[in-house]
Amino acid sequence: MLGNLKPQAPDKILALMGEFRADPRQGKIDLGVGVYKDATGHTPIMRAVHAAEQRMLETETTKTYAGLSGEPEFQKAMGELILGDGLKSETTATLATVGGTGALRQALELARMANPDLRVFVSDPTWPNHVSIMNFMGLPVQTYRYFDAETRGVDFEGMKADLAAAKKGDMVLLHGCCHNPTGANLTLDQWAEIASILEKTGALPLIDLAYQGFGDGLEEDAAGTRLIASRIPEVLIAASCSKNFGIYRERTGCLLALCADAATRELAQGAMAFLNRQTYSFPPFHGAKIVSTVLTTPELRADWMAELEAVRSGMLRLREQLAGELRDLSGSDRFGFVAEHRGMFSRLGATPEQVKRIKEEFGIYMVGDSRINIAGLNDNTIPILARAIIEVGV
């Protein structure tokens, strides 16, 4: 039977990672995979995470199952981190998941359980795995305009016009902050206009919050999500702990379902636990316990916030350096968008041919749509990238 399987196209980003590893050149630069790296190219374990694990090692007495929906302390801590004072526990269902991707998948499954004819609106462009998962599930996908290729900013008028076509029973996937792959983000005033459109259409928002703390700060990065939560009666939020806690391999994520009333919350919580049971039963515990320990221990939380702020400000500094280098080489401000974008990524606007030349001639690897991982740069590689960008004619 297994001989009937068809070959699957490899994930382009993961294939690029393999190609980079096979490249024998000493000066090669990896700007492809979306993983934070420090100035030495290392993805470190955060100090507070180390300390939390040490506490767990000393105090844990069992490895038995936790609940189907996850550890209550983790659920509460994540709800408060994301929604702040706006968290309404009596109407919020919470699910621990296998990473942010698991949260996205369970959110889609939950919405499809509620509406078998679910249609999903996604930004053009979006994280490729969004569409891949939806296609695999057989869900109809509709794109809405988002990125302006000329300004490298948000095409907000196009976005509004396209989202106005959504209907009650549709889902609208929004990036909570640090848009992947473009780095172009909505202002709070623009979030308010999106909320007005959602109020009119009755569409269900699903907010992908994978990079809270990587853009303008923990509170600032959650502002759009909180605004939507304050105005729309039903909201799904898929959050990842991979980036802001640096626990990529622990696969720690969370799904919040904001409901109109307590009775609906009970229905959603039961359905979400059911989905976990049908998929993998109990969610991973170790990463969730790390997160809850950090967030509920004042000294660990303070140290985590300080280290996360250093990561965030470091990426902003790299953005400003790259934009400045490109300004000097080009004699113009046409690359100013690099400094304005937020998060790990920026889309440069290079053609596939230019991306290929940059890889072949300079040993610099980026995704085919010219998305670069800002965190993959350092003081030494920024001038090399800037020169490559100018020389290939971006």
Swiss-Prot record:
Major site of localization recorded for this protein? cytoplasm
Give the location in the cell: Cytoplasm
Which terms are listed as keywords in the entry? Amino-acid biosynthesis, Aminotransferase, Aromatic amino acid biosynthesis, Cytoplasm, Pyridoxal phosphate, Transferase
Positions modified as N6-(pyridoxal phosphate)lysine? K243
Which residues of this UniProt protein bind substrate?
G34, Y65, W127, N180, R371
The record ties this protein, via NCBIfam families, to: PRK09257.1
Q: Under what name is this protein listed?
A: Aromatic-amino-acid aminotransferase
What lineage, starting at the top, does this entry show?
A: Bacteria, Pseudomonadati, Pseudomonadota, Alphaproteobacteria, Rhodobacterales
